[in-house]
UniProtKB/Swiss-Prot annotation:
This is Melanoma-derived growth regulatory protein. Belongs to the MIA/OTOR family. One of its GO terms (biological process) is extracellular matrix organization. Pfam families: SH3_2. Cartilage primordia and cartilage. SUPFAM superfamilies: SH3-domain. Induction: Repressed by retinoic acid. The keyword Ligase does not apply.
Amino acid sequence: MAWSLVFLGVVLLSAFPGPSAGGRPMPKLADRKMCADEECSHPISVAVALQDYVAPDCRFLTIHQGQVVYIFSKLKGRGRLFWGGSVQGDYYGDGAARLGYFPSSIVREDQTLKPAKTDVKTDIWDFYCQ
């Protein structure tokens, strides 16, 4: 009887892993960002990649020269050189949406969709890796 309870406990613990099993928080790139709305759900602008960029870790997007990039946020302060967005083909293609960061210097903004007038505080989920 005691062994069956121990076995049941082991099975239950292995079936429900802890909160860190699905991903991990990464260091914040910035404390604040500018967006088109409070949720940063509307794109600010559309840009074209001027060069290739290989993501150094899971917070960033790998971008290829010529790809269309939808910009959803622009980091402020120490992270001001990075913007957040999605590459065409990921967000509007068949695959799941993938948002990430990239250096603002590798893109050229071609079309403004909404002004980035909303100052939003970043949180742990902005830099969380799956």
